[in-house]
Design a protein with these regions (language model features):
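Helix-loop-helix
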Residues: 33-106, 111
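Conserved catalytic Walker-motif region of ABC-type ATPase nucleotide-binding domains
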Residues: 20, 108, 134-136
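An intracellular "coupling" helix at the cytosolic face of ABC transporter transmembrane type-1 domains
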Residues: 5-54, 97-100, 117, 140-145
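Residues at helix-coil transition
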Residues: 2, 9-12, 29, 66, ...
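Short, solvent-exposed loop/turn elements at beta->coil junctions and helix N-caps
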Residues: 121-125
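ABC-type nucleotide-binding domain
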Residues: 127-376
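Helix-loop junctions and hydrophobic alpha-helical segments within the transmembrane domains
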Residues: 7, 28, 108, 242-244
């Protein structure tokens, strides 16, 4: 139901209703066919059972008349035969249930036996308070193997430094985050932290050092406390509230009827975009990461929400290595260093003022943004 407003705004209720009815009818046809097959199988089993019973009683009756067996023996045999026959008749129903269960189990087994494409064979514990370095990284997504997302990408980031990645769409900025989180591994080159290749480190321990705040934060269908505490190790109420205060979220949470126990709905549908973003920031703060990844965290926010998020980010970024993806250059002017990317490579890097005189691509991006802001 999270897209109900989109359906209503485009006046597509009738079309969605028609599609729903069509899908229900298709499901009904399948269910009716299954019921018919089950009824035929059950009827056939009952027919065989009753036919066998009639034949058995006829033969037994003849034997009683001719004195080969007593009526009591025939009655006992019929009684036990009915019990056994009924048990066999239920096998038709059990067989249908087994067929449905086998289909579901087959899909589950495919998931259970699937192996991760990212091998977690590393045993090293990541170092603390050290530098991050990309060394000649080359990468292409499996779906587009002939289109490199990163090509000879080289970048060094000192501990505690805030670095902003800017560039046109498709420059490879988000791919940098994908590789840092080891959703993929480089095809060539290496990513090193403290001099050690990420592939030599324990995947769980490495990811514990990172917190990601995406452009569209993912919230779960639970309460606010659950969403902020997600991933933390036995957090207390006080710790959750402290994280919310740093994220400038405590104030609006207190205005909700049930406070931190307020149910958010699917994807946090009951909150505004700025409020969802601050919940995601509070989650990142509570995890106390050494590396903070901000993926255009304020690009879709209004002015007031952006101010609150920027204030929270200023506090969070203290003494943490921070990498920021931003299309709005005004949000990263104060970064320690701005790295300009294009076609998967580092084109230039430096502070804002320096890039405005030395990098034509950065100048063009800044000019286009300035014109857009003036037009608005």
């Amino acid at each position: 139901f999270q897209s109900i407003k989109v359906v209503q705004s485009f006046n597509e209720e009738i079309a969605e209703k028609t599609a729903f009815v069509r899908n229900v009818e298709q499901a009904f046809v399948v269910a009716r066919s299954r019921v018919l097959q089950r009824a035929l199988l059950t009827g056939f089993a009952i027919f065989l059972l009753m036919g066998g019973m009639v034949g058995m009683m006829w033969s037994g009756g003849v034997d009683v008349i001719e004195g080969r067996m007593t009526g009591g023996e025939l009655g006992a045999f019929v009684f036990y035969a009915i019990i056994v026959g009924t048990a066999f008749a239920t096998l038709s129903e059990v067989w249908g249930d087994l067929q449905r269960a086998a289909g579901a189990a087959e899909r589950l087994m495919e998931l259970l036996v699937a192996t991760s494409e990212i091998p977690d064979t590393g045993t090293q514990t990541p170092a603390s308070n050290t530098a991050l370095a990309f060394k000649g990284v080359h990468f292409a997504y499996p779906s587009r193997p002939t289109h490199p997302a990163l090509s000879d990408f080289t970048l060094e980031i000192a501990h505690g430094e805030s670095v902003a990645l800017v560039g046109p769409s498709g420059a490879g900025k988000s791919t940098v985050f994908e590789l840092m989180l080891r959703f993929y591994d480089p095809i060539a080159g290496a990513i090193r932290f403290g001099g050690a290749d990420l592939r030599e480190m324990s995947l769980d321990r490495w990811r514990q050092k990172i917190a990601l705040v995406p452009q569209q934060p993912s919230l779960f269908s639970g309460d606010i406390f659950y969403n902020i505490a997600y991933g933390a190790n036995e957090p207390t109420q006080a710790a959750v509230e402290a994280a919310a205060q740093m994220a400038h979220a405590h104030e609006f949470i207190q205005t909700l009827p049930e406070g931190y126990q307020s149910y958010l709905g699917a994807q946090g549908v009951r909150l505004s975009g700025g409020q969802r973003q601050r919940i995601a920031l509070a989650r990142a703060i509570l995890s106390d990461p050494e590396l903070l990844l901000l993926d255009e965290a304020t690009s879709a926010l209004d002015t007031e929400s952006e101010w609150h998020v920027q204030q929270a980010l200023t506090d969070i970024m203290q003494e943490r290595t921070t990498i920021i993806i931003a299309h709005r250059l005004s949000t990263v002017i104060n970064a320690d260093r701005i790295v300009v990317m294009d076609k998967g490579r580092v084109i230039d890097s430096g502070p804002h003022d320096e890039l405005m005189t030395s990098c034509k691509l950065y100048q063009r991006l800044a000019r286009l943004q300035f014109q857009t802001e003036q037009a608005s």
